[in-house]
């Protein structure tokens, strides 16, 4: 009996039976009835619906949260599992008070539907006891809606409307069923403090389906560069992943995180650039993961492995190169000043700079040849300090040489005014723009990470001369000046941010020492201070919820795929480590299982990436039109962990009582979209994309409230073209209904670029307390902006 009550409280357990009302009171009241005779068949737990709070806007947390996460079997006295129920769905509309903001709204001509009584629902617990009857009312949607347009923003201090946000995350087919869970009793509950929650049926209100793409499982049949995992049960060869065999859907999920809502058509050049780079890095990380899965003595890493070359081969073979076969003079469509690239091969893929080694790219211009782009990395004693004037050393003369085994270095010689050098000189006469890419190689022994390249914009070549170089031979020097009117490079702004007296600094550390690095607040717009709230670094569970740590693995050193047969944590992740050894996430999964508090592996384990807190120098800043936002003072490589979204974990009943302060309420639910998986199926030969969630496959059970208690994640704004995405992670318990929500970078993010993710609002589905449709413009400024937040 006690166990039945516990499960009912945590999950809003299954409803025993609901007698359908067809041709009855529902139809008499004019309520629209579902198809198939007005009866909606719901699976156990996965199909249970709950009435949503009437809030301004709704966004969901990752898959596996809410009541869809797992099937909880509740037995009655006869020991049988409760039968699948059939529930009559109708439009639900009830007027609720949303606080002072809505009380002040002047809304007229509102028609509310008459309430319709639906037969009470009865919850059955073990032993045949009935907890109580649950009644539901339904009504017609209100017409004569009023459009309320407000300025965008997520800060309560910005004066905008309150919002509840949807976090869209990745899932695949396996997450929709939520079968084979390891723990059916993940939480302990203090019975004296618990009141039975009141689940309700929801009908009619639909939420947006578009957003950050969620990946379905992919299957690779390409033998040359198959991105699959090894066979876990193979005794002949435990470590080598056999390219002659097909990979199962669970073995391959490339993270080239998908497009945002409204951008799947690919009409935007900017969107095409982002999609291509995400595909490239997804393949890179998968190749690296494949190599890291081998025993150390068999790894190619550090022994000539060029994952960028191998990944580019896959993209080129599948026709994913942009601007292939053409040379572009001037701006490359979709490439913006300040864009960062981890590998030089990315410049080739996008058509920014096609030579893989030469520093000067050129094309035919009439009868002459002019330069189209240069890579200035300081290798030729280039002067890179001035942001507007660049002194570039010509190519040739055997200046830059790398000694290879069995080869002798050539003697330096004078540079000649030919090929690229001649093209740069001709650009002076023709006054043609030259793209400049500044490169700074990372000071690390790991060459597989490549260099760091930043697109600086367009320059004009002003003059050139010849002088003696550092090696004693004549070299050509070219002076280029940046064309005015282009955005300033981020590293110039970073220099200003590191000055002793920083303009606009209004708080040194909003975390008050709770984070490893201070998180400052900067406002260069006005005199507004950051909103007051209690900073916390951990998700706050209610008193009645006590997470039960999962079983530990047997590892005493860092967990690896080589120990998949004995490491329980690796086995939970499909027999592979979901991160590269540098901490970058490899692929989007429904849920990532990290090592828990009972595991004996060290803190440096590859399966503890998100448990070390925030490592990046983040700060909040006042935006021009969207309240407070979040940015980073350094470059963020794609796949990097950013932060967790933390707050107070609430049940729906408690969250409904806090509706007056719903700006930071997050409904935990499911979202699934296979748009990126469709793109990956085109990239990788033989891959298949799974189905998307149906319109009715959504539910909600829990909420995270960061209004009064939260961390820096509460300030992250919306964008129609986001650079972050959310991922389910479990480590301190195994209840997939309430996972930790972690933000990861889905792009290479330059310093001081605002960090954003897609709130996934449903257009024309957000209503105020009077039932009127509300509209709010979007000011994200993305090339694929939907122009409306909801």
Swiss-Prot record:
Region annotation (Disordered) ranges: 251-271
Listed GO CC annotations: chromosome, centromeric region; nucleus
Catalytic reaction(s) noted: N(6)-methyl-L-lysyl(9)-[histone H3] + S-adenosyl-L-methionine = N(6),N(6)-dimethyl-L-lysyl(9)-[histone H3] + S-adenosyl-L-homocysteine + H(+); L-lysyl(9)-[histone H3] + S-adenosyl-L-methionine = N(6)-methyl-L-lysyl(9)-[histone H3] + S-adenosyl-L-homocysteine + H(+)
All copies of domain Post-SET, residue ranges: 774-790
Protein residues bound to Zn(2+) 2: 553-554, 569, 595, 599
InterPro entries in alphabetical order: H3-K9-MeTrfase_plant (IPR025794), H3K9_HMTase_SUVAR3-9 (IPR051357), Post-SET_dom (IPR003616), Pre-SET_dom (IPR007728), PUA-like_sf (IPR015947), SET_dom (IPR001214), SET_dom_sf (IPR046341), SRA-YDG_sf (IPR036987)
Residue span, Pre-SET domain: 551-613
Residues annotated as binding Zn(2+) 1: 553-555, 559, 567
Primary localization: nucleus
Domain SET: 616-760
GO molecular function: histone H3K9me2 methyltransferase activity; methyl-CpG binding; methyl-CpNpG binding; methyl-CpNpN binding; methyltransferase activity; zinc ion binding
Keywords from the UniProt entry: Centromere, Chromatin regulator, Chromosome, Metal-binding, Methyltransferase, Nucleus, S-adenosyl-L-methionine, Transferase, Zinc
EC number(s) from the headed UniProt entry: 2.1.1.-, 2.1.1.367
Annotated compartments: Nucleus; Chromosome, Centromere
GO biological process: methylation
Domain YDG stretches: 330-482
Annotated residues for binding of Zn(2+) 4: 720, 778, 780, 785
Residues noted as binding S-adenosyl-L-methionine in the record, renumbered to the chain: 626-628, 662, 664, 714, 717-718
Top-level division of the source organism's lineage: Eukaryota
Chain sites annotated for binding Zn(2+) 3: 559, 595, 601, 605
Domain free text: Although the SET domain contains the active site of enzymatic activity, both pre-SET and post-SET domains are required for methyltransferase activity. In the pre-SET domain, Cys residues bind 3 zinc ions that are arranged in a triangular cluster; some of these Cys residues contribute to the binding of two zinc ions within the cluster.
Role of this protein: Histone methyltransferase. Methylates 'Lys-9' of histone H3. H3 'Lys-9' methylation represents a specific tag for epigenetic transcriptional repression. Seems to act preferentially on dsMRNA.
Family, as annotated: Belongs to the class V-like SAM-binding methyltransferase superfamily. Histone-lysine methyltransferase family. Suvar3-9 subfamily.
Name the record gives this protein: Histone-lysine N-methyltransferase, H3 lysine-9 specific SUVH6
């Amino acid at each position: 009996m006690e166990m039945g009550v516990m499960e009912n409280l945590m999950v809003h357990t299954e409803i025993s039976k609901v007698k359908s009302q067809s041709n009855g009171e529902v139809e008499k009241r004019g309520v629209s009835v579902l198809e198939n005779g007005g009866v909606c068949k719901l699976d156990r737990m996965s199909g249970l619906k709950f009435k949503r709070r009437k809030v301004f806007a709704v966004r969901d947390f990752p898959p596996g949260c809410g009541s869809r996460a797992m099937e909880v079997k509740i037995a009655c006295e006869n020991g049988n599992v409760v039968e699948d129920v059939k529930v009559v769905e109708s439009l639900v509309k009830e007027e609720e008070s949303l606080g002072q903001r809505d009380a002040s709204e002047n809304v007229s001509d509102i028609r509310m539907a008459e309430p319709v009584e639906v037969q009470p629902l009865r919850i059955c617990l073990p032993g045949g006891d009935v907890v109580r009857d649950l009644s539901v009312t339904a009504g017609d949607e209100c017409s004569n809606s009023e459009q309320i347009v407000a300025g965008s923003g997520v800060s309560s201090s910005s004066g905008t409307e309150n919002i509840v946000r949807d976090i869209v995350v990745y899932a695949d087919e396996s997450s929709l069923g939520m079968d084979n869970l390891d723990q059916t009793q993940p939480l302990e509950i203090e019975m004296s403090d618990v009141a039975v929650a009141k689940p309700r049926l929801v009908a009619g209100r639909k939420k947006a389906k578009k957003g950050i793409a969620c990946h379905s499982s992919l299957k690779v049949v390409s033998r040359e560069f198959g991105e699959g995992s090894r066979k876990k049960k193979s005794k002949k060869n435990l470590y080598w992943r056999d390219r002659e065999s097909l990979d199962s859907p669970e073995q391959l999920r490339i993270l080239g995180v998908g497009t945002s809502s409204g951008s799947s058509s690919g009409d935007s050049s900017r969107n095409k650039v982002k999609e291509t780079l995400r595909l490239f890095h997804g393949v890179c990380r998968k190749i690296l993961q494949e190599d890291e899965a081998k025993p150390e003595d068999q790894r190619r890493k550090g022994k000539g492995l060029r994952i960028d070359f191998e990944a580019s081969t896959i993209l080129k073979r599948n026709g994913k190169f942009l601007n292939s076969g053409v040379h572009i003079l001037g701006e490359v469509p979709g490439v913006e000043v300040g864009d960062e690239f981890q590998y030089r091969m990315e410049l080739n893929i996008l058509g920014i700079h096609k030579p893989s080694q030469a520093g000067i790219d050129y094309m035919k211009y009439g009868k002459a040849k002019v330069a189209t782009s240069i890579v200035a990395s300081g290798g030729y004693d280039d002067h890179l300090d001035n942001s507007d004037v660049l002194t570039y050393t010509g190519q040739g003369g055997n200046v830059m040489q790398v000694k290879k085994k069995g080869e002798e270095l050539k003697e330096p010689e004078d540079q000649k005014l030919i090929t690229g050098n001649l093209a740069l000189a001709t650009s002076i006469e023709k006054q043609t723009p030259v793209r400049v890419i500044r490169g700074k190689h990372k000071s690390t022994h790991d060459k597989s990470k490549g260099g760091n390249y930043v697109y600086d914009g367009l320059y004009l070549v002003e003059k050139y001369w010849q002088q003696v170089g550092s090696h004693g031979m004549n070299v050509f020097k070219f002076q280029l000046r940046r064309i005015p009117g282009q955005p300033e490079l981020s590293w110039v702004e970073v220099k200003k941010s590191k000055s002793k007296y920083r303009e606009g600094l209004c708080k040194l550390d909003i975390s008050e020492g709770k984070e490893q690095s201070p998180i400052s607040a900067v406002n260069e717009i006005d005199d507004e201070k950051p909103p007051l709230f209690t900073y916390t670094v951990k998700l706050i569970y209610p008193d009645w919820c006590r997470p039960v740590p999962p079983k530990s693995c047997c590892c005493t050193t860092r967990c690896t795929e080589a120990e998949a047969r004995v490491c329980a944590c690796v086995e939970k992740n499909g027999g592979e480590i979901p991160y590269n050894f540098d901490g970058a996430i490899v692929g989007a999964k429904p849920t990532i299982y990290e090592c828990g508090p009972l595991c004996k592996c060290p803190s440096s384990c590859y399966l503890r990436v998100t448990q070390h807190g925030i490592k990046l120098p983040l700060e909040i800043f006042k935006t021009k039109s969207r309240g407070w936002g979040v940015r980073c003072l350094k470059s963020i490589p794609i796949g990097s962990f950013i932060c967790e979204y933390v707050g107070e974990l609430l049940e729906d009943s408690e969250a409904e009582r806090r509706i007056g302060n719903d700006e930071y309420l997050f409904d935990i639910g499911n979202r699934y979209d296979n748009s990126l998986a469709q793109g990956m199926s085109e990239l990788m030969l033989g891959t298949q994309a799974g189905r998307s969630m149906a319109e009715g496959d959504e539910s909600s059970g829990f909420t995270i409230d960061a209004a009064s208690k939260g961390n820096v994640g509460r300030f992250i704004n919306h964008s129609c073209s986001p650079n972050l995405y959310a991922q389910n992670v479990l480590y301190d318990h195994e209840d997939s209904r309430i996972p930790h929500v972690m933000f990861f970078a889905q792009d290479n993010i330059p310093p001081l670029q605002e960090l954003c993710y897609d709130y996934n609002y449903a257009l024309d589905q957000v209503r105020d307390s009077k039932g009127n449709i509300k509209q709010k413009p979007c000011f994200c400024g993305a090339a694929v902006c939907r122009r409306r937040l909801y």
